[in-house]
Amino acid sequence: MEGEDVQALVIDNGSGMCKAGFAGDDAPRAVFPSIVGRPRHTGVMVGMGQKDSYVGDEAQSKRGILTLKYPIEHGIVTNWDDMEKIWHHTFYNELRVAPEEHPVLLTEAPLNPKANREKMTQIMFETFNTPAMYVAIQAVLSLYASGRTTGIVMDSGDGVSHTVPIYEGYALPHAILRLDLAGRDLTDYMMKILTERGYSFTTTAEREIVRDIKEKLAYVALDFEAEMQTAASSSALEKSYELPDGQVITIGNERFRCPEALFQPSFLGMESAGIHETTYNSIMKCDVDIRKDLYGNVVLSGGTTMFPGIADRMNKELTALAPSTMKIKIIAPPERKYSVWIGGSILASLSTFQQMWISKEEYDESGPSIVHRKCF
């Protein structure tokens, strides 16, 4: 790569939001919903120059006339045509760059299928003509962003949660655990418990309102049962929220009942272990000699770890599971909503990383499988 002065692009494609920007920046320039919308009825608005598809915020604002699709489900790309539209939108509309002029760092979910990494690589080189690219595991980037190379990352976004033990910069694939319980499920659960109180939230538009209620008012209780009793005996925990139409609703124990599902998935009718137990199970799958380093470096990452109280609760629950002498430390960086992107920004701007890029020449020589040799 001769372009020393060319800024690399960093794109973190999440199930719910896409975060994109320039390597070396401390925050993403563009954050928009990972959605593609297509008109439900064609040609109603004659002469309006109606597009055949909309991406991100524009799709969100026109959702009344569109069918919305999320091309990334549970962290894994399932619809490549729509994914290509999202990348196109990222380059040309959000960042306003020519992809053929910049190296591109993409992120992937832990345990992403091999065929998927190849497809990402192929699209970048063949559709967008990028000069160079790289694919990095999301949780590893979050760990880098926290200034560590060893630790266990509990990454929870909109579509999926993972616990990823990392030793000296390498994820340990045999010990990675996936939990299909994340932000979207918590929003759905909040809709359900608010409906039980007599408020009706059903449409996709109303779901966005509930997501906002969740993000602004929900928190994790340190002791769930005690908190339930406090909520029942006083109004100290009640908060009011004004809906877009001016109606004011009051929310009480829903504030902490909603995120409690992270620790007790049975609330959602799921039989899986909670995030604390999943973290513990991940650690127990690792070599006994590195467990101490993992317990002492539990890094929270992703938007669904933004609830107040989550770190203290995680500490309490892990302490109960771990050997009694073990020192446990939960790291919850304030910017953890974007720590995957930030880690990518750091990585792509390191001088030592510059030889790691897959160049167009290497791709033309070896084809998409080059990604398994160079990105691990």
From Swiss-Prot:
GO terms for biological process: cell morphogenesis; chemotaxis; endocytosis; mitotic cytokinesis; phagocytosis; phototaxis; plasma membrane repair; response to cAMP. Pfam families: Actin (PF00022). It catalyses: ATP + H2O = ADP + phosphate + H(+). Its EC number is 3.6.4.-. Its main location: cytoplasm. SMART domains: ACTIN. It comes from the Eukaryota. The keyword Nucleotide-binding applies. Keywords: ATP-binding, Cytoplasm, Cytoskeleton, Hydrolase, Nucleotide-binding. One of its GO terms (molecular function) is structural constituent of cytoskeleton. It is found in: Cytoplasm, Cytoskeleton. One of its GO terms (cellular component) is pseudopodium. Coiled coil: none annotated. Actins are highly conserved proteins that are involved in various types of cell motility and are ubiquitously expressed in all eukaryotic cells. Multiple isoforms are involved in various cellular functions such as cytoskeleton structure, cell mobility, chromosome movement and muscle contraction. Belongs to the actin family. This is Actin-10.
